[in-house]
């Protein structure tokens, strides 16, 4: 029995190692950023023993799927070897979106969202608040409040004529609230939208901007 176990142990370890390697090779990430310096250059994902292909970081769309070197890695500027963010992926799942928002203790903070699943569907909005004030509002009949440095999925309802939503965005200052935008957003059944709220130094107010992601019909 002992001899059998001694022979079997290396085989099991080899299988486990191969499985872990396959897991790492199968993890895909799409990136976008709230903002980026003009001279940032290409980025790489780095672990102790692996390094990804370099890629450009967009701010108006998502990257093509990038192969992650593991579930825990550093994001660096390739040209300067400058650490930008630490990224920790969930233990399960192999397809993610990573939003890079302005960090407190590092240039970026990574916000990880599963790419597939019922939690974030076509037609939904993911709102992330990097500003110093709570953000509140409504998309159609769906209301929301988002604390600073947090985010949530908003599933809109109550479209007008099935074509657009009345959208009201505002901030809370102390016990009072005030509007920062009133507009209409179109109903988009094949698009998911990421909305960043941030402190705008030019306007000296909370600003926001959106990144749309087209989701093909075969994707959930």
Task: Map each language-model feature to its residues.
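Positively charged n-region of N-terminal signal peptides that target proteins for export
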Residues: 1-4
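Bacterial N-terminal signal peptides
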Residues: 6-15
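Intrinsically disordered, low-complexity polar regions and short flexible loop motifs
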Residues: 20-220
